[in-house]
Amino acid sequence: MTSATAGLNLSDSVYERLLRERIIFLGTQVDDDIANKLCAQILLLSAEDPSRDISLYINSPGGSVSAGMAIFDTMQFAECDVATFGMGLAASMGQFLLSAGAKGKRYALPHARIMMHQPSAGIGGTASDIAIMAEQFAHTKREMAELIAEHTGQTVEQITADSDRDRWFTAQQALEYGFVDHVVSRAAQAGGTGQ
């Protein structure tokens, strides 16, 4: 009989061991470094076995829109399903990625908090540059609202209204809103992910 940890020793990092189980973890602010790491992990695991799910655990305050969109696009690009698990805090881009998991495979742990708001950015420079950046920012805001609507079943207008200011959700409220498909308190309740 072999165990899931056969061949591993104590010097293996926790994250390496999780990766071998097809579990990846976003436990920081979303930036280019973590986005590149997660994208590489998703691509690697998808190439290794496109028939097995990847489980992405999210405990993140959010962060960079462009870095988050790289993760989002890679999740959609992967041949295998990416199941998402909200734990602790899934705010801003963390919420966006949580709701972007494979339909039917988006989970929140019971005490997770989910927060949605409109994207924000600091803009500076010449008047012409500010006008260009403002136009790009408006496009990004609209695009994100459309994607959240697609993943939650809400209308774009509802997402736009609800994200005007910080809007907080309990795990149960996130389920009712459509960010997640299940609230689970035990791994066995999320059957089939990472197996």
UniProtKB/Swiss-Prot annotation:
Coiled coil: none annotated. GO terms for biological process: protein quality control for misfolded or incompletely synthesized proteins. GO terms for cellular component: cytoplasm; endopeptidase Clp complex. It is found in: Cytoplasm. Its EC number is 3.4.21.92. It holds the Pfam family CLP_protease. InterPro entries: ClpP, ClpP/crotonase-like_dom_sf, ClpP/TepA, ClpP_His_AS. Disulfide bonds: none annotated. This is ATP-dependent Clp protease proteolytic subunit 2.
